[in-house]
Every structure is written in C-alpha cells, then in structure tokens.
C-alpha cells in the first residue's frame, strides 16, 4: 500500500501535532553514502544472497563475489552490529547497548493509546535532526529496525507521518519500497516494466495498440456500411459512392456490434490512462532506487536489475534480514529463486497442468489437442482467478481435503458460465480477428509469397517447452535461438518426388514469365492493354506467375544441404529441452519429424487455428473441462508446498542444490542422451542453475 499525502495531512490534524512536520529526517548524507555503495564496482558482493546454490552477480561476466569490508552504509542496510557480536533486540527496551550518546526514547505505545482515546496530547517523536541520531549504537538500541525508511511509520499502523512534499524523489521511492506489502504484485510490476523496456516504450506500445483497434473498427465500418458498392463502376469516384448519414442507415445488429467495439475501446482507454501513475512510480523506482536510467532500459540485463533489487532488501521491513521488524517466521525471502517463484507462481502451475495432462484439451470429435490464446485466457479466468486470492496467494480452501467436492462443483459451474459467455462474444471476436489478420498479413504474403512456408511453434508447444521458474524473456531468447535449427531439421526429410514436381512447375512458370517480360520491354502498353484471357491482362499473369514461382522455390531445398537428421535434432533439443522417450532411438525416422511438425507448424495454419479456437473453445468449456474439475482441485492440493519466505508454490518449481549436470547441452551432446532430459523439474533446475550460477558455463545473455 503506497503512501497517500491527503491521509498524511489528516493524521497531523487529528493529532494536533503540526510542529512534527519540522522534524523531517535529514538523510542526505546517509543516502549519498548508499548511492556511492550502489554505484561502486568494488563491493558488488555484499547484498547478494546465496540460496539453493544460486548466486546473482550484476555484471554479465559473472565475476566471483569477494567479501567486502564494513562500510558506513552497513548502518542502514546490513542489520548487524559492527562493534558487537550481540544481536539486536526486536523490542527497543529489552536490551541496552553501550553508547557514547544518550539513546532517544520512542513512546510509541503512548502515542497509539492517545490516538485510540481521542486525546489531543502531542505524541513524542524522535528528534531526527539530532546529529547523533544516526550513531549506530543509538539507532540500534533505540529501535529494532536500523533503516530510516522502515523507521517511518507503516501505513495504517502509523501514529504520525512525515510530510510527503518535504521528501525528495529518492526518499519517496524508498518510502514506497519500504511499505510494499504485496511483494508478489510488486515484483511482477518490476518485471513487466523491465520486459516493456521502460515507460515510453510501454506507453507508445499501448497507444498504437489502441490506434490499431480504432483503425480496424473505423475502416471496417466505413467499407461495409458507408460505400454503395453497386454504384462504384458507374460513378468512378469515391465521393459519388459514399453514403450520407451511413451510421443512421445501419441495421440494428451492426449498430449493436459497433457499440460493443466502441465500449471496449473506451474501457481500454480508461484502463491505460489510469495505469499511467503506477507506471510513473515504477519509472521512479528504476531511476532513484535501482539507479537504472530510462535510456538504458532497452539494453539493461535482468541480472543487473536483480542485483540492484537485492541491494534494497534491508530497506523493506518484510524482507530485512534477522527479523528486525517482523519475526523470522513472517519474513519474506528475497533472492533470485524467490523472485522467480513469486513472478511465476501462477505460470508454474499452468506449466504443470499442461505437461501432466491434468487439463484435457483434446477436441471430442476431431481427436486433436488444441490450445489457443483464447483457450489460455479462459483457463486463467476459470481456474487461476478462482484458485488464487486478490493477493496472488493460493486460497486455503484448496489445501483442505474436506473442500474438494464443493470446489470442484464451483469450478464446474465457472466452466459452464465461461462457455455461455464465449458463445455470446465468439462471433464478434472471430470477425475482428479475421479482419485484423487480413490487414496485417496480406501485404506480407503478397510481396513475399515464400513467407507462406514459414513455421512457428504452436501455443501448446511453447507451454510444453517452457520450464519451471523460467522467466518469459529467458524463454523467448531460448525459443528464438531454436528457429534456425528447427527449420534446418524439418528440411532433413525432403519428398524427392514433390521436389521434382515443383522444379518442373517452377520451370514452366518461369518460361511463361520470361516471355511476358520480354514482350512488355518492347511495348510497355501491352502490359495493361493485351488480354491473355478474358479480362485478364499481362500484368495480372505476371503477378500470378511470380507468386507461384516464389512458393515453388521455397519448397525446393538448397542443393548444398547436408542430410543428417539425428545431428540436426540434437541441435534442436539443446534449445527446446524437449525429447519424448521414444525419440531417442528413432531420431532418423519420419515419425519423429511428423510429431515435431505438429508442434512446429506453418504460421498460416497457426493463424487459422487461432480463429477456429474462438469458435471451438466453448466446446471444451461445455464438454471437456467440467469433467477435469475434480482432478484440477486434487492437483492443487497434492502438488502445493509451502516454502519459507515465499509461500505456497507448485511443488515442481521447488529446486534443490547442486544439479548433477552443469548445462542442458551436456545432457544432449553426449553419445547417449541422458534420460534426465525427460524430467522437466530436474531439467528446470539445471537451466536455472546455469542461468544464475557464477561457476556454471552459460551462453551470453543479450
């Protein structure tokens, strides 16, 4: 919960303590020391957390951590006494530490009692302007929390607040970070801002997204309702065929559809506009707390962001070490492993549901597994919005075996309701998707017909390949690196009879095209006036033959291609990390290639399935998903584990130390592929260790 200035002023008025506004802490010198520590390259190992064998380093070269000497910033962030081995007390009056200066008193209990009784007695506040206030012994003996930002009263538990406009931008950012209570949501916002490449990129992306939707709606409405198409030929001009007051002449159904689209567009505008303050606060967090400039956002690595974030852990009361503000039992863990688990808490469950076959996504009649973006959205709404609460935590009812029947019935009803909603809006969404994809890809396929043969992974393949605790940008890098190897593997199984056929077709069409080009060179007017068939000129056939030749040549493999399917498949597996058991002894077979092609399909086929998925998803919601509701409830209960400092997470995403292999490549490139490649949790652990451990060989991250 972030700070609210208006509420702050009201607190001061109620307490009749306006003089307290003058006691704003002067933290400039301390913050300058902290900034020097953050920007320094000599002490980059002090805030790093080593948990489960994972060590984070800021730089891409992953220099090994070197213990640093104590420096003045430990006063604020280390939470450990420099001159004494005695641990500080959680309660300020329970122990006394020798000090050169008298310890300030903090009569917080009296202040809270005055608030409850309505007394106008001024609460006694610490004198932040005292030059000896920040003495380490005084500070540590006077208050259990050594950070000045967590010494500021926390939200609704406060009895007096520092005047907001007296704080600098950097102080306000650290104040917000010190008062973060929903750590899952905040870390997800930090990661989303990172993948969005900064405030300007996110706003521009959203702006053009809205403009694209507006253009599709407006242009489609104009060409379908505002043009008199039968009058196009006689008039020969746009002004002569444009209808006046075309909106008023629309049919009721068209009018309703238009208003639905406009309502959606308005809601999108409102959401994006109201989200700008949150994005601005995240921008300030990156600039003032993480010390990452906006200009560096497109190129900064996640390791650097993570390193800077870990240096702030002692500023937040929930993540500070040694339980100085909260007990060790309630302390939130903050390291690379915990951050990945918090960001991917729901995604880890989704990966497990798909890879373990808990959700049946096979169409009843077609006997084909289908997973489109529409199906993903419905699964998230029906299952994850039901399983997790507003704080992003697993509901306690799903851990109770006695609630199994009730939860499965509620989940079944959610599937049925979602099915009716999909039936209601599916035709409208399908029409929009067809028009949008037509506008988007027509020019590409028209100018480059060979693009029809390009392949992309299906959504089902992507969720099958993704590993536990693998952040989205790491996964995108891995998959993007695999496309060249995957296309090379698919071309290892040519149909030589079809190749000869397309070579012949390409030769015939090329001959006709050559003659037509030569004719038009001598008389350019023949390109438009000369008709080869009725109403079809030379220009038409030049475009047609050129497109067919491009498609034919894209099917014909390169003459220098070396056929080694087993070697090519091993190369693909190093990126996809996917190999069913029966592939091991059949890498050369056509059956393996066909199964792989079902995951690595033509892009145009994927687009068609996305459109059909809008219409077929209600079938899954009505007939397939309800029968899985009890298995889904059982899965969340049986495969949920409580990790201290992280909360309840998917058991498959819980890693142990020291994996047996240093990298996934070592599993695949050996003479006999290790059966460990089929164990996704173990493979995920190896990949995670490879990404974040200093000693493991790893590829350079872009």
From Swiss-Prot:
Q: What spans does the record annotate as topological domain Cytoplasmic, numbered to this chain?
A: 1-205, 271-421, 447-496, 556-603, 625-702
Which biological process, per GO, is one annotated for this protein? mitophagy
UniProtKB keywords: Autophagy, Cytoplasmic vesicle, Endoplasmic reticulum, Golgi apparatus, Lipid transport, Membrane, Phosphoprotein, Transmembrane, Transmembrane helix, Transport
In which compartments does the protein localize?
Preautophagosomal structure membrane; Cytoplasmic vesicle membrane; Golgi apparatus membrane; Endoplasmic reticulum membrane
Q: Which residues cross the membrane?
A: 206-223, 252-270, 497-522, 538-555
The answer on whether this UniProt entry bears the keyword Phosphoprotein reads yes
Any one GO MF annotation of this record: phospholipid scramblase activity
**Gene deleted: what happens?**
Impairs atg8-processing.
- Composition-biased stretches, type Polar residues, lie in 108-120
Main localisation, per the record? membrane
PTM per Swiss-Prot/TrEMBL: Phosphorylated by atg1. Atg1 phosphorylation is required for preautophagosome elongation.
Mapped to this chain, the residue ranges on the Lumenal side of the membrane are 224-251, 523-537
Listed Pfam families:
ATG9 (PF04109)
Q: Where is this region: Disordered?
A: 35-128
Cysteine pairings via disulfide bonds: none
In this chain, composition skew of type Low complexity spans: 94-107
Q: Which GO terms describe its cellular component?
A: autophagosome; cytoplasmic vesicle membrane; endoplasmic reticulum membrane; fungal-type vacuole membrane; Golgi membrane; phagophore assembly site; phagophore assembly site membrane
Tell me how this protein sits in the membrane: Multi-pass membrane protein
Family label:
Belongs to the ATG9 family.
Oligomeric state and interaction partners are given as: Homotrimer; forms a homotrimer with a central pore that forms a path between the two membrane leaflets. Interacts with ctl1.
What is the official name of this protein in its record?
Answer: Autophagy-related protein 9
Q: Which species does the entry assign this protein to? A: Schizosaccharomyces pombe (strain 972 / ATCC 24843) (Fission yeast)
């Amino acid at each position: 919960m972030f700070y609210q200035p208006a509420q702050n002023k009201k607190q001061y008025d109620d307490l009749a303590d306006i003089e307290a506004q003058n006691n704003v802490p002067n933290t400039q010198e301390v913050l300058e020391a902290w900034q020097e520590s953050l920007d320094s390259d000599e002490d980059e190992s002090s805030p790093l957390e080593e948990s489960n064998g994972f060590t984070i380093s800021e730089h891409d070269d992953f220099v090994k951590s070197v213990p640093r000497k104590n420096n003045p910033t430990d006063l604020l962030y280390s939470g450990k006494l420099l001159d004494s081995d005695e641990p500080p007390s959680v309660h300020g009056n329970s122990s006394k530490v020798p000090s050169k200066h008298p310890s300030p008193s903090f009569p917080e209990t009296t202040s809270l009692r005055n608030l409850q009784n309505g007394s106008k007695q001024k609460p006694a506040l610490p004198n932040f302007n005292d030059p000896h206030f920040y003495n380490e012994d005084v500070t540590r003996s006077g208050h259990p929390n050594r950070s000045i930002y967590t010494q500021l009263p926390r939200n609704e538990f406060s009895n007096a607040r520092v005047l907001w406009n007296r704080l600098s931008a950097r102080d306000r950012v650290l104040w917000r970070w010190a008062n973060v209570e929903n750590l899952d949501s905040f870390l997800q916002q930090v990661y989303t801002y990172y993948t969005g490449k900064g405030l300007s990129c996110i706003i521009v992306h959203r702006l053009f997204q809205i403009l694209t939707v507006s253009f599709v709606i407006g242009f489609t409405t104009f060409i379908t309702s505002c043009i008199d198409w039968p009058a196009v030929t006689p008039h020969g001009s746009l002004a002569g065929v444009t209808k006046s007051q075309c909106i008023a002449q629309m049919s009721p159904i068209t009018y309703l559809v238009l208003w639905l689209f406009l309502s959606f567009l308005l809601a999108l505008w409102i959401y994006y506009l109201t989200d700008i303050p949150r994005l601005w606060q995240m921008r300030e967090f990156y600039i003032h707390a993480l010390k990452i400039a906006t200009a560096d956002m497109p190129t900064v690595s996640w390791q650097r962001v993570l390193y800077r974030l870990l240096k702030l852990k002692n500023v937040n009361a929930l993540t500070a070490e040694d339980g100085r503000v909260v007990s060790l039992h309630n302390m939130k863990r903050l390291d690379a492993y915990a951050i990945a688990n918090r960001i991917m808490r729901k995604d880890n469950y989704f990966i497990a549901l798909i890879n373990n076959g808990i959700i049946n996504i096979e169409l009843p009649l077609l006997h084909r597994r289908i997973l489109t973006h529409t199906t993903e959205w419905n699964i998230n709404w029906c299952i994850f919005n039901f399983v997790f609460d507003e704080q992003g935590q697993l509901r306690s009812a799903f851990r109770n075996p006695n609630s199994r029947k009730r939860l499965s019935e509620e989940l079944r009803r959610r599937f049925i309701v979602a099915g009716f909603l999909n039936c209601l809006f599916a035709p409208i969404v399908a029409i929009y998707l067809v028009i949008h994809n037509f506008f988007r890809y027509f020019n590409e396929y028209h100018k480059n017909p060979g693009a029809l043969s390009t392949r992309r992974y299906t959504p089902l393949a992507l969720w099958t390949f993704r590993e536990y605790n693998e952040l989205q940008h790491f996964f995108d890098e891995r998959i993007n690196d695999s496309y060249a190897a995957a296309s090379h593997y698919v071309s290892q199984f040519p149909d030589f009879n079809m190749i000869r056929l397309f070579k012949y077709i390409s030769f015939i069409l090329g001959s006709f095209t050559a003659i037509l080009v030569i004719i038009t060179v001598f008389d350019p007017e023949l390109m438009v006036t000369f008709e080869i068939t009725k109403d079809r000129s030379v220009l038409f056939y030049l475009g047609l033959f050129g497109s067919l030749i491009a498609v034919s040549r894209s099917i014909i493999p390169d003459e220098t291609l070396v056929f080694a399917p087993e070697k090519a498949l091993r190369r693909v597996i190093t990126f996809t990390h996917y190999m069913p058991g029966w592939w091991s002894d059949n890498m050369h077979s056509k059956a393996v290639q066909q199964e792989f092609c079902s995951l690595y399909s033509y892009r145009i086929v994927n687009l068609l399935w996305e459109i059909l998925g809008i219409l077929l998803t209600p079938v899954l919601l009505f007939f397939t998903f309800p029968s899985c509701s009890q298995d889904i409830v059982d899965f969340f209960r049986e495969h949920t584990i409580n990790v201290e400092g992280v909360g309840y997470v998917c058991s498959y995403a819980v890693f142990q130390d020291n994996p047996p292999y240093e990298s996934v490549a070592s599993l695949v490139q050996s003479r006999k592929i290790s059966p460990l490649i089929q164990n996704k949790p173990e493979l995920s652990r190896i990949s995670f260790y490879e990404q974040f451990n200093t000693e493991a060989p790893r590829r350079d991250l872009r």
